[in-house]
Regions:
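N-terminal hydrophobic/helix-forming segments and targeting peptides
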Residues: 1-437
Length: 437
């Protein structure tokens, strides 16, 4: 990867990540370009000191790591997620209708529903194809508009602008053109197979707009899927800048799936991907249980997921004492109910690394009367007991079909994560860090 961070590289990743499967494939391609070797989970792994590897699970989650060059003493690790709120196609075969080609969908995650209306949409995901030897996955994404979700005109709904409660089953079903059209046939052509060879599929709707700079000076940008592909790409970039100068430290980067629906899947943060890979790496190194616990204690894991910037039209929705400014730096996310993993201990360490790197940090906290959401860190903590810090970048219109964020913040995140992967971290005793700043 280019040693200079480029916002265009982030845009390419956002444009490529039209589904969790495509996000994972895009990350895998970047890793392979940088010398990382694929290790299928079902294969026996032959891992070498200092080696660079990655594995995928379900084709929608991916984990990469650099092996330590000497006896294991600790880890660097950053986690993000590959999925975004969207609409899942229930089945490929269009429903019978005399006028339109229809394929029913259901909501995935907590999207802003009306943001999907009246815009050109495509589909993306994977089809499972029957072959002579079994079943094969193939990514599909027609590079054109194939669907839309039409609004009910104002003449039939005079109260539309006074607030409407959308019923996903009734108001938000897409059309795929005129009656007689076949979504299965379109995807079969994309996959290079016959329609009858598609056994099953995982398909979602996706926006057609490309990532684009916004603002009189181009300081912001708009795109679909900023949450959380912005953090995924910037942490991956930072991970790839790690020089591996500490012989006993291993470096990890992971992008989970299904965060938007609770992470409770095999490929989600509540699954065992992270723990399984670490265990296999430690076993290859001959690490004892005690050595494993000590190494995981000498770790600061970054859970990276975006947060809400203070809205220009509704500043009252944010904590008045902690306004979040787009372009103001990385968010250090805190929550008294432990929805975020940041503590004074872990926040101090990350803040010190950012200060040394010249990266500004903003404290993110919800209003006391707003419960707020959660993210990867506290769920991943059910599997891996490492010190963690929740970070992110401020954005507007989270979970809309199109979101807005800051170009400067993306650069800040990339710079901070690169500094993190090149900073020795050691916990000599509980409540004390030694940082190689």
């Amino acid at each position: 990867m280019n040693h200079e961070f480029s916002i265009d590289g982030l845009f390419d990743f956002l444009n490529a990540g039209v589904s969790a499967f495509h996000s994972t494939a895009a990350a895998a391609a970047i890793l392979e370009e940088n010398g990382y070797q694929n290790c299928p989970e079902s294969a026996a792994w032959q891992l070498a000191p200092g080696g660079k590897y990655y594995t995928t699970r379900n084709g929608s989650a991916i984990m990469a790591w650099r092996m330590p060059k000497g006896p294991l003493t600790g880890w660097h690790a950053a986690a993000s997620h590959s999925d975004s709120p969207t609409w899942r196609v229930k089945k490929l075969d269009c429903a019978e209708d005399k006028v339109f080609a229809k394929a029913e969908t259901e909501g995935y995650g907590g999207m802003i529903m009306p943001s999907w209306l009246d815009r050109p949409l495509s589909v993306a995901g994977r089809v499972l194809v029957e072959t002579e030897s079994g079943i094969e996955s193939r990514l599909v994404h027609p590079d054109r508009a194939v669907a839309c979700i039409p609004n009910l005109c104002i003449h039939f709904n005079r109260d539309l602008n006074n607030g409407m409660k959308y019923n996903p089953q009734v108001d938000l079903q897409p059309i795929f053109g005129a009656a007689g059209g076949s979504l299965r046939a379109v995807l079969a052509r994309e996959a290079g197979v016959k329609p009858e060879e598609i056994v099953d599929a995982d398909i979602v709707l996706c926006t057609r707009e490309k990532a684009e700079r916004l603002g009189l000076n181009g300081e912001y940008f708009m795109s679909g899927r900023i949450d959380d592909l912005e953090c995924a790409y910037t942490t991956l970039w930072g991970f790839l800048q790690g020089r591996g100068e500490e012989e006993g430290r291993g470096d990890v980067w992971v992008m989970f799936d299904n965060e938007e629906v609770g992470s409770s899947s095999r490929q989600g943060a509540c699954g065992t991907l992270f723990a399984d890979v670490l265990s296999r790496v430690e076993e290859s190194l001959g690490v004892t249980k005690e050595q494993s616990i000590r190494a995981r204690t000498n770790t600061l894991l970054l859970s990276a997921d975006n947060g809400h910037a203070t809205h220009p039209n509704h500043p009252e929705k944010s904590d008045p004492a902690n306004p979040i400014v787009m372009g103001g730096g990385i968010l250090l996310k805190t929550n008294a109910s432990q929805k975020y993993t940041t503590s004074g201990f872990t926040g101090a360490a990350f803040s010190a690394i950012c200060k040394k790197a010249g990266v500004p940090v903003q404290t993110f906290a919800n209003r006391a009367d707003v419960p707020g959401g959660s993210t990867l860190g506290n769920l991943l903590g059910h599997q891996i007991l490492m010190p963690m810090v929740d970070i992110g970048l401020g954005q507007l219109a989270m979970h809309s079909a199109m979101e807005t964020a800051s170009c400067a913040d993306a650069e800040y995140m990339a710079k901070a994560v690169a500094a993190y992967y090149n900073t020795p971290i050691f916990q000599p005793k509980d409540g004390e860090w030694k940082l190689g700043l």
